[in-house]
Amino acid sequence: MESLPARLAQASPASVDGTWQRHVPAKFIAGALNGRSATGRWGTENGFPVLYLGRPTESVTVEAYRHLIDPVADAAPPISPRALITCTVSVSTILDLRSATNRILSNLTMQQLQSDTRDRDAYRACQNVAAVAHQLEFHGVIAPAATQMGETLVLFTDRLPASEEPARIAEKLWTELPPDPRNPGQGRRLRVVRQ
């Protein structure tokens, strides 16, 4: 079997346009569209900077619940205020993992792409693909969202030319999370603790 770099070099780069969103702690609103080197599905603490975006809004909301609520036992854990950032994107040279062909080339399964936030093996597999894509000078990765609704766009901000940087078009303060789209009518929300 060919190496991962050799296989991913066969993937056809895609272009991605449209409106995307992300949630951030409100205190980081100014730098919300900057990439960060941090451990996540597509990045590592000591790696290259990544910027996570999602669509539709329901997917971004579920992602907030997956990371802030689902792993916590308290029915209403306290959080700081958050912000929903909306931006427009027009990027090229994206590894498109929505394509079954590219998922086969990357050796990633839908189960790995949509794994629980605590599945370290799935995260390592995705991080490895992102590292190779970055090495091959892709500008990012687009994949089915882990929320199982919508898409995730991960931009490698150190690879983006200035003309492809996301443009902020709106921001909305969340003093509590919107209702969880996975549980319509359930009303389970976060309460905000003022510091």
Predicted ranges, named:
Residues 41-71:
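Extended catalytic/binding region for NAD+/ADP-ribose chemistry, centered on the ART fold
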